[in-house]
Amino acid sequence: MAMKDSTMPNFLNIKNFDKSFDDLSSLSQLREEAFLNLKDIGIPSKKFERWKYNDLKNDIRNIEFSLCKTSIKIKKNKLDKFEINEIDYFKKNKNHYLQPLKYLKDEGVVNLNLSYSNLFKVLTIKKDLKKPIIVDIKSEGHGMSFPRILINIYNNVNAEIQFLNRGGLGFINQITEINIGKNSSVKISRLNESSSIHSETFFSNLGRNSEINLKNLSIPKNKSRFQVFNSFIDEYSSAQFKSVSIPYENSKDDFLVHNNHLSSNCKSDVGMRSILGKETESSFQALIDVENKIKNSRADQDCRAILLDEKASMNAKPEMKIYNNDVICKHGTTIGSLNQDHIFYLNSRGLNKFEAEKILLQGIISEYISEDSPLINFLPEKYK
């Protein structure tokens, strides 16, 4: 069925959960529970504080409510041994199916995915990895897709994972969950060059003395939303999120990062670098949440945007909810054009305007994406 111009997309106006959408009868009760939440909450629009820069409800109104072709391919080193499961994992572990609602119950896109998830990958990593795992998510054609990825990392494990999000002409609504055990570390490189309207909700749950380090390169060709929710479940855990955003012309890149310091002695570090050309827009919301009894927390937020055209725009909203004094927090936002004094200096050294700007922009990108990063190969040619 197709979405029509009404107050809500067509599939929200039906009285009952559309069980004809899939054949997962063993999970239908759980999926229907998520659907009822969705009907109460609705598809996100600018009236929701978390979505104040993005009107998803309007963006997907006319997209056909049918499945587009989507695949998730896992590429790994032959010597690395870990479990790969699909929907059977949730059939055997039904109590895990609605786990995202434990951390975020009032989010429409999460309940939408849980209602209609159609593609599943579950990775269970019990030992150190010798080489990075590559998770390649690719979509083709019109319609919608609701992929779900769950990664369980056991105690005392070091792992590296690369996510590639590409293609599509419709709407992709993805959930990614990573549970990180005690004394474990995961390094993540994420690429977004989706041509669909793309929404991903990313959860990480950090055990004692664990860490996650995420580097993101976002080059959307349409409207994109990446929202990250890090929960510090136990002490001495840390999360680092660094993102470079270079949207194509007439594209939009929207980010939200929520670091929830549920335990003492934890660190979070969030950074954003946006390079914005003609008819592009980027948004960055960062929230630090430190409860009253939580001690010795450290949290950093940093956002810098370079506007290369008068028709480029950047929105930034750093926010801190801190209920005690035993915390060190820093945040800063800088939005503007390239430094003309720096360009003049490079001109005086024999470089033309284009060459000077390229060097300055490469310097900004290299703050987060180093020469040895796998993301370097995906940068637009003019920034390599």
Regions picked out by a protein language model, each given a short descriptive name:
Residues 14-16, 334-341, 359-360:
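Short acidic alpha-helix initiation/capping motifs at coil-to-helix transition points
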Residues 54, 362-363:
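Short secondary-structure capping/turn micro-motifs that flank functional sites
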Residues 97-344, 348-351, 365-384:
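Conserved beta-strand/loop scaffold segments within soluble protein domains that form the structured core
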Residues 2-119:
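N-terminal amphipathic, basic helical "cap/leader" segment at the start of enzyme domains
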